[in-house]
Amino acid sequence: MLDVNYFDELRIGLATADDIRQWSHGEVKKPETINYRTLRPEKDGLFCERIFGPTRDWECYCGKYKRVRFKGIICERCGVEVTRSKVRRERMGHIELAAPVTHIWYFKGVPSRLGYLLDLAPKDLEKVIYFAAYMITWVDEEARHRDLPSLEAQISVEKQEIEKRMNVELEERARKLEEDLAALEAEGAKADAKRKVREAAEREMRQIRERAQKEIDRIDEVFTRFKNLKVQDLEGDEVLYRELRDRFGQYFRGGMGAQAIKERLESFNLEAEAEALREQIRNGRGQKKARALKRLKVISAFLNTRNSPMGMVLDCIPVIPPDLRPMVQLDGGRFATSDLNDLYRRVINRNNRLKRLLDLGAPEIIVNNEKRMLQEAVDALFDNGRRGRPVTGPGNRPLKSLSDMLKGKQGRFRQNLLGKRVDYSGRSVIVVGPQLKLHQCGLPKVMALELFKPFVMKRLVDLNHAQNIKSAERMVERATSGLSRYAMVWDVLEEVIKEHPVLLNRAPTLHRLGIQAFEPQLVEGKAIQIHPLVCAAFNADFDGDQMAVHLPLSAEAQAEARILMLSSNNILKPADGRPVTMPSQDMVFGIYYLTTIKPGATGEGRVFSSDAEAIMARDLGELDIQAKIKVRLKDVVAVDDGTGSWTPPDGWQPGDPLLVETTLGRILFNEALPPDYRFINYELTKKDLSTIVNDLAERYPKVMVAACLDEMKTLGFHWATRAGVTISISDVVMPPRKQEILEAYEAKAEKVQRQYERGLITDDERRQELIEIWTQATADVAREMEANFPKDNPVFMMVNSGARGNMMQVRQIAGMRGLVANPKGEIIPRPIKSNFREGLSVLEYFISTHGARKGLADTALRTADSGYLTRRLVDVSQDVIVREEDCGTERAISMRIGVKGPDGTLTRLPTVETSVYARTLAEDVIVDGKVLAAKGSDIGDLTITELLAHGVEQVRVRSVLTCESKLGVCAACYGRSLASGKLVDVGEAVGIIAAQSIGEPGTQLTMRTFHTGGVAGEDITHGLPRVVELFEARTPKGVAPISEVTGRVKIEETEKARKIIITPDDGSEEVSYQVSKRARLRVAEGEHVEVGTQLVEGTVNPHEVLRILGPRAVQVHLVQEVQEVYRSQGVPIHDKHIEIIVRQMLKRVNILESGDTEFLPGELVERPKFEEENRRVVAEGGTPATARPVLMGITKASLATESWLSAASFQETTRVLTDAAINAKSDPLLGLKENVIIGKLIPAGTGMPRYRNIRVEPTEEARAAVYSMSGYDTGSYASGYGQFGTGSGQAVPLDDYDYGSYDR
């Protein structure tokens, strides 16, 4: 086996017949598989042991050699090598074909590579390959030219012969006629009889003339065809071809089937053809030039690589190892076999029949038919169903060919190479574990014992509870079955599990927080326990969700799990850098209850000298937790009353004691916060809590934040329980004035209806009016209802604290349901006046079901679409890794941070959170000669606040859009890693993080927005489809034109459409745009517009923006438009993630003129490669190539990647592989996917080359500690210890570390 860690690239190419024979261990001659009586493989068959290796370890077929001591011997009786049976997974065979066949990928794929190479239409190519037409493969021009006069003479002689013969025949017939007539005359026959005889004779003579003329024409036709014969002519007329061959066989060769193609390829001159094509490209135009370019691409691929075009025609085909196409016996004596065996059997059967026919010397027509069938059998084996009807198995199911094995979700790439099953894992249902710390999880004992079995067994042997591993295993087995005398097993498990993190994962893993590490705590029962605060990250709830547990084994893996993946280190969300572990639901309610003031509660107005005294009063029942009291507090830094209007008393210093008016509940809450944090003195809802947690995350280290969160969780649950909040039907309080409000609006609605009946308004206007009236009514009822709820009502408290639900839901329960939409998405103008507490009437219930069902259907569709979007995003950005500290670019982009109000004060822009926040400054910010923020520093919340205070409106920041790194991006341009809150590390896979951040909220985006019944104006795509449209760079529906010039607007109305005409300022000719009558204009007659102004309402085409305004503008446009969609759904995503995807979309340029470079016009090249090649050419004094930037959609960009492994595993597998093989593409293995596929460590994070060759050396103390372990020879252990985490990057094989001397 080759070791994947030792090569840097992987090349794919075309295999020639010799290659295939070289790989092979023998020829498969018979279609037999397994002998049904002995169940052993048949000799020379598809499972033959002589070719593929023994079925049993170290045992030959006939049984002469058994045991490992005969390793490597080849048995002289049966010819089987004695070796391991697993060679049957790697040894290949081959089938020698009696006639060559073409490879279907190269002839039938679009575009047909073989057709391009030979300049044949695929239709004609098909005729030749499938024996419907002959092809001329060689013409001896010289001989033909030389012998033409003599041949012509021969032909004319032949024609004269025919004419002579005809004349003789005619004379003969005339003589016979004379005789017949004379005889009739003698008999005295009637004139009638004479006429008949004469006519018959004339008819025969005419036939003789015609026959002769036909022969002469035929000779002419054959000769003309011969004179004009050239290589690659097709001849579909069998008879004509035969005659040609019989007459002029020595001057040309021709044939049909793959044999003809093969002969043609052998004599094909690639260089000459390429030269001719270049000439054509230089002088040609239009269609011709385009075709020449395409052909040159294929031909230069063969010229530039070591590939031979002969590889597209096969003389022998490989047979893949038998263990990859197994045959297993089912109970009942039947066999289940892989489809490949059936396909191979058809090939072998037809091949053997063809050999036999050839030996018998069968007629050509029979042989050709058999050859055609062989070609079809090989086609079906390579790619079933690509041509004609697929070969089907039992039950009319198409058989899975080699191509199908690679394709799709179930194919080799996605099923086995990118998604493997792993050992040391388990899964179970999750339940909540409120007693856990943030970094812990509860692991069921039974599960833990199974997962940690090897560790436990080894420890049992170490502690002398067991003599050897075998008996330790038995002990573990018995402990599981509950025998009390093996209780020490559980103690050992406790010891082993300490400090050994496990990974928990919940599917679907939409972003990196879907897998986190925890320290396991053993629990009884069979359910995994989860900390309530990490549910948001996993998107988990406890209604039966399951989670998987994985065990990191090696020392390195454990270190990574503990440092990088521990849940308390993953408090921030990578999408926007804000905490993801927020108290929710019960916790929010508990804290809200705790910090609320209840007027008139026990002990109100009392004053206490310390918080301890207040707590004592409460314990004695003298004080209510929600009563307003005054307390003298120590160590107060500041007091936050929620409004920011608190002023400290005179002479008070932060840290001095202070008398604060508050409640005991608030004092208890503040104990959960860091001691030097301001005293929070107001009622806390979910929003306030999130502000506080945000602030904590900005100011304090993660450990502190995690501790605070845990405290809050405990407090929240404790007080939510004490609050004893319940809901009964009477808690749903209905507004008493509801009827009255509705009657008033009903009157308005009736008035509108009457106006309509009188014909004063149209139907559309009536609908609009009614919808407005009832929307107003619903809002009024809702307002009335809200005002009417008592402040201590449980329903109101739940909504108000942000624990669960919102006012809209309460409105439907207690107010009125309001307007609903019909299946078409239009709003029905009659509202539902009842609420759920009163109950709906039948009609009301019926019309409200539409929306509900549509919602469910939408969600299902959305999940699938969103998953597919994430997959495409990951694929396009997977090789964007932070590869260097700083690319040193001077370029940057300006971003606004504040906007001036009417009174001249600067207020923070709401979009700062997702645009400027967490970036690196590109230059110093200087105000009044003082540097406020230095170049290269990170912009956090505090910096932004300070800049705004000094009146700074915009800053220049680094961005990945302007990064000049050749591969990936640099740390400075990316800025702060949002997940860690520090500058991003070199090696961070920022591309994948970006893809996950954009894809994960995809399910929350709506599919379609409701149209408010028949409103004019184009329906613009919204939600998920809009995001897809942007990332795929599609031209949107109802596209709005943008101005190509700066000038004045003139608007012309015509019958059908409007014309917007712009007269440029520089006096060049005017530009006109046709827009539909319905489009709403954005410009007015006579207005002055700049280049790139949008002329009508609607969506602009990003390709136009790129063409007219350049790459920078289209980058801004795409980022803004994507953000627009996410903001409308209230999903915060940082711009830098979208920028990474946009950077990938604009990575390539389209070559216009190739100059002296090796590019072809129309080729798509990555920008760094283009610039490098141009520099090289200019240095040598040549002309550089010119190109223009192109915007590629993410699917297209993924398929255009340099890495063929990544592209093939993404989509259109066969097309990508066909192309890659012809171009002998080499995969530099720079992305993540290609390394996962071949099983190398990914080149990101700790797998980066710069981190790989690090050795872990123990400190002196650690060594000393190890030596003091009893019973171990000091020297031997020390020598083995240095081997941990060797530079190989391999996992440490645990079983091999018996603490003994183990030297590699």
From Swiss-Prot:
<feature type="binding site">
    <location>
        <position position="970"/>
    </location>
    <ligand>
        <name>Zn(2+) 2</name>
    </ligand>
</feature>
<keyword id="KW-0479">Metal-binding</keyword>
<keyword id="KW-0808">Transferase</keyword>
<feature type="binding site">
    <location>
        <position position="541"/>
    </location>
    <ligand>
        <name>Mg(2+)</name>
    </ligand>
</feature>
<dbReference type="Pfam" id="PF05000">
    <property type="entry name" value="RNA_pol_Rpb1_4"/>
</dbReference>
<dbReference type="InterPro" id="IPR038120">
    <property type="entry name" value="Rpb1_funnel_sf"/>
</dbReference>
<dbReference type="InterPro" id="IPR007081">
    <property type="entry name" value="RNA_pol_Rpb1_5"/>
</dbReference>
<dbReference type="InterPro" id="IPR000722">
    <property type="entry name" value="RNA_pol_asu"/>
</dbReference>
<keyword id="KW-0804">Transcription</keyword>
<feature type="binding site">
    <location>
        <position position="75"/>
    </location>
    <ligand>
        <name>Zn(2+) 1</name>
    </ligand>
</feature>
<feature type="binding site">
    <location>
        <position position="973"/>
    </location>
    <ligand>
        <name>Zn(2+) 2</name>
    </ligand>
</feature>
<dbReference type="GO" id="GO:0003677">
    <property type="term" value="F:DNA binding"/>
</dbReference>
<feature type="binding site">
    <location>
        <position position="963"/>
    </location>
    <ligand>
        <name>Zn(2+) 2</name>
    </ligand>
</feature>
<dbReference type="InterPro" id="IPR007080">
    <property type="entry name" value="RNA_pol_Rpb1_1"/>
</dbReference>
<dbReference type="InterPro" id="IPR007066">
    <property type="entry name" value="RNA_pol_Rpb1_3"/>
</dbReference>
<dbReference type="GO" id="GO:0008270">
    <property type="term" value="F:zinc ion binding"/>
</dbReference>
<dbReference type="InterPro" id="IPR044893">
    <property type="entry name" value="RNA_pol_Rpb1_clamp_domain"/>
</dbReference>
<keyword id="KW-0548">Nucleotidyltransferase</keyword>
<keyword id="KW-0240">DNA-directed RNA polymerase</keyword>
<dbReference type="InterPro" id="IPR042102">
    <property type="entry name" value="RNA_pol_Rpb1_3_sf"/>
</dbReference>
<dbReference type="GO" id="GO:0000287">
    <property type="term" value="F:magnesium ion binding"/>
</dbReference>
<protein>
    <recommendedName>
        <fullName>DNA-directed RNA polymerase subunit beta'</fullName>
        <ecNumber>2.7.7.6</ecNumber>
    </recommendedName>
</protein>
<comment type="function">
    <text>DNA-dependent RNA polymerase catalyzes the transcription of DNA into RNA using the four ribonucleoside triphosphates as substrates.</text>
</comment>
<feature type="binding site">
    <location>
        <position position="887"/>
    </location>
    <ligand>
        <name>Zn(2+) 2</name>
    </ligand>
</feature>
<dbReference type="InterPro" id="IPR045867">
    <property type="entry name" value="DNA-dir_RpoC_beta_prime"/>
</dbReference>
<dbReference type="GO" id="GO:0006351">
    <property type="term" value="P:DNA-templated transcription"/>
</dbReference>
<comment type="subunit">
    <text>The RNAP catalytic core consists of 2 alpha, 1 beta, 1 beta' and 1 omega subunit. When a sigma factor is associated with the core the holoenzyme is formed, which can initiate transcription.</text>
</comment>
<keyword id="KW-0862">Zinc</keyword>
<dbReference type="GO" id="GO:0000428">
    <property type="term" value="C:DNA-directed RNA polymerase complex"/>
</dbReference>
<dbReference type="Pfam" id="PF04998">
    <property type="entry name" value="RNA_pol_Rpb1_5"/>
</dbReference>
<feature type="binding site">
    <location>
        <position position="545"/>
    </location>
    <ligand>
        <name>Mg(2+)</name>
    </ligand>
</feature>
<dbReference type="InterPro" id="IPR006592">
    <property type="entry name" value="RNA_pol_N"/>
</dbReference>
<dbReference type="Pfam" id="PF04997">
    <property type="entry name" value="RNA_pol_Rpb1_1"/>
</dbReference>
<feature type="binding site">
    <location>
        <position position="62"/>
    </location>
    <ligand>
        <name>Zn(2+) 1</name>
    </ligand>
</feature>
<dbReference type="Pfam" id="PF04983">
    <property type="entry name" value="RNA_pol_Rpb1_3"/>
</dbReference>
<dbReference type="InterPro" id="IPR007083">
    <property type="entry name" value="RNA_pol_Rpb1_4"/>
</dbReference>
<dbReference type="Pfam" id="PF00623">
    <property type="entry name" value="RNA_pol_Rpb1_2"/>
</dbReference>
<keyword id="KW-0460">Magnesium</keyword>
<feature type="binding site">
    <location>
        <position position="543"/>
    </location>
    <ligand>
        <name>Mg(2+)</name>
    </ligand>
</feature>
<dbReference type="GO" id="GO:0003899">
    <property type="term" value="F:DNA-directed RNA polymerase activity"/>
</dbReference>
<feature type="binding site">
    <location>
        <position position="78"/>
    </location>
    <ligand>
        <name>Zn(2+) 1</name>
    </ligand>
</feature>
<dbReference type="InterPro" id="IPR012754">
    <property type="entry name" value="DNA-dir_RpoC_beta_prime_bact"/>
</dbReference>
